[in-house]
């Protein structure tokens, strides 16, 4: 326990918060080019074929990014926008690809949570 005089002289050291998305270099999103688009299986209790892309960002970093939603149009050399956000059951996947931005199309036929998947507002049905 420091004395008051020691605190006056030196003060307390601030705890620095470590970023969970280091490759973005303190930016909200980064542009990148897909180097590989593939599917992978999740960790133990879950079972699926999760769509993932290996992306080379504009700052030179290579990351694994998850492709959310049903169906996608990504292939090698597609330009994508990458945001932070991990996928809990995929080890090593700490980034998400933004749907509806750059070369990535929005999810077709999506009616709810459309903004998260880059889907346009559906046309109203005639009464």
UniProtKB/Swiss-Prot annotation:
Region (Disordered): 101-127
GO molecular function: rRNA binding; structural constituent of ribosome; tRNA binding
Function: With S4 and S5 plays an important role in translational accuracy.
Cystine bridges: none
Residue positions, PTM 3-methylthioaspartic acid: 89
Domain of life (superkingdom): Bacteria
GO CC, alphabetical: small ribosomal subunit
Bias kind Basic residues: ranges: 111-127
Quaternary assembly: Part of the 30S ribosomal subunit. Contacts proteins S8 and S17. May interact with IF1 in the 30S initiation complex.
GO process terms (BP): translation
Taxonomic source organism: Flavobacterium psychrophilum (strain ATCC 49511 / DSM 21280 / CIP 103535 / JIP02/86)
CDD domains registered for this protein in UniProt: Ribosomal_S12
This protein's encoding gene: rpsL
Protein name in UniProt: Small ribosomal subunit protein uS12
